[in-house]
């Protein structure tokens, strides 16, 4: 089989690899049918990642099961979402919802980067899934795999960034400072779940147009809005934008930072102390809340397909992926996306 390999800045190529095989009765082998780059993949391809190449890239896809161990509940033909992080489902951390911190594997074991071992990437023709029953989530009927190609990471992350807060604070005012798909998904979910105001900040006019289609107000840039928002979501990976988000919070407000901050920076700690805000900077325990996120997607209240910036053939991955796109989706001619 082939796996797409990141080899240098803005360069990826197909490389041959052995076909994966079942290593236990709980494994499954899947073939991605619709896959998308995560926002962090764009940073990696631009040369900003912390890990030098080469390595198999990709950690967002909807896949079709092609083989499964005898103890698995999955069967060939099932359409599934593959969470980005490897988790066993039974250790103490997994049982507590901390699936990104599973103790059965090295810390931060994941698809798409050789952190915590080498698990391959989801831009591969075939992928072995350990603990398939714990990891894989069936794609609900009626959902388009192309629209949900990001359900491994960015889509459920956006759900986690806003949905629990709006449950605790109905009608909250939401600030989104973004540079990619995560912030746009947040706008859609926040609107669907009853935010009283959503302001989306992004210098890209095409991104702002999508946010406006979701019912958000937009701006190319802003100065801090004193006590303006109950929740701020920052997904730029830029510390000045994170500082703006923090300085725009109402007393006891909450800031979710979903940007990958590869560079250090200084935060307004005294202002944060005086306002009593909470800042969370965290990777997502996606498997724990993926079913709830997919339930919202299946309800028809949201439209993640609007964020898809183009649909491309699987064979175009090496040429198209390194280009600048918001959320391209790559589909397999040999693995139809229909059920």
Model-derived regions: residue spans:
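Glycine-rich phosphate-binding loop and adjacent beta-alpha segment
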Residues: 195, 239-299, 332-339
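A short acidic, Gly/Pro-enriched loop at the edge of an enzyme's catalytic core
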Residues: 224-232
């Amino acid at each position: 089989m082939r796996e797409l390999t990141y080899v240098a800045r803005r360069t990826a190529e197909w490389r041959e690899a052995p076909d994966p095989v079942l290593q236990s009765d709980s494994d499954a082998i899947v073939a991605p049918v619709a896959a998308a780059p995560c926002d962090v993949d764009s940073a990696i391809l631009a040369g900003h990642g912390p890990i030098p190449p080469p390595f198999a890239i990709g950690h967002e896809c909807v896949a079709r099961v092609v083989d499964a161990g005898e103890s698995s509940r999955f069967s060939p033909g099932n359409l599934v979402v593959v969470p980005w992080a490897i988790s066993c489902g039974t250790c103490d951390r997994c049982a507590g919802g901390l699936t990104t911190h599973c103790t059965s594997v090295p810390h931060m074991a994941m698809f798409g980067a050789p952190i915590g071992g080498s698990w391959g990437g989801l831009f591969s023709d075939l992928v072995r899934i350990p603990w398939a029953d714990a990891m894989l989530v069936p794609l609900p009927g009626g959902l388009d795999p192309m629209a949900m190609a990001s359900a491994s990471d960015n889509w459920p992350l956006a759900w986690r960034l806003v949905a629990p807060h709006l449950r605790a604070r109905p009608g909250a005012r939401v600030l989104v400072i973004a540079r990619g798909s995560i912030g746009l998904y947040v706008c859609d979910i926040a609107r669907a779940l009853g935010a009283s105001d959503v302001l989306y900040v992004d210098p890209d006019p095409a991104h702002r147009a999508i946010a406006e289609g979701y019912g958000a107000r937009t701006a190319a840039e802003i100065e801090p809005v004193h006590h303006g928002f109950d929740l701020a979501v920052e997904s730029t990976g830029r510390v000045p934008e994170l500082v703006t988000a923090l300085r725009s919070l109402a007393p006891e407000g909450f800031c979710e930072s979903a940007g990958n901050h590869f560079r250090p920076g200084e935060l307004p700690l005294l202002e944060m102390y005086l306002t009593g805000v909470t800042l969370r900077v965290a990777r997502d325990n996606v498997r724990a809340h993926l079913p709830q996120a997919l339930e919202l997607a299946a309800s028809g209240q949201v439209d993640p397909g609007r964020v898809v910036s183009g649909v491309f053939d699987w064979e175009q991955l090496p040429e198209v992926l390194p280009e600048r796109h918001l959320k391209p989706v790559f589909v397999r001619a040999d693995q139809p996306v229909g059920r």
